[in-house]
């Protein structure tokens, strides 16, 4: 998913939760980061590189 997939979608249904799909989560995290650049990394007190490494590792050595 890319935030640029559908630039026309700016509003979300008020019943949707932040973790209901990649698009919703991506837009929410982008919003948080727009409030304070680096917010997502600061939230975890880790660099983006560390977060990315942990994310990849969560899928195992072959991305499974």
Curated annotation (Swiss-Prot):
Name of the protein in its database record: Basic secretory protease
Keywords: Glycoprotein, Hydrolase, Metal-binding, Metalloprotease, Protease
Cofactor: a divalent metal cation
Covalent S-S links between cysteines: none
EC number(s) recorded for this UniProt protein: 3.4.24.-
Function field: Metalloprotease, digests gelatin and azocasein (in vitro).
One of the Pfam families matching this protein, by short name: BSP
GO BP annotation list: proteolysis
Control of this protein's activity: Inhibited by EDTA.
Processing after translation: Glycosylated.
First-tier enzyme category under EC: hydrolase
GO molecular function: metal ion binding; metallopeptidase activity
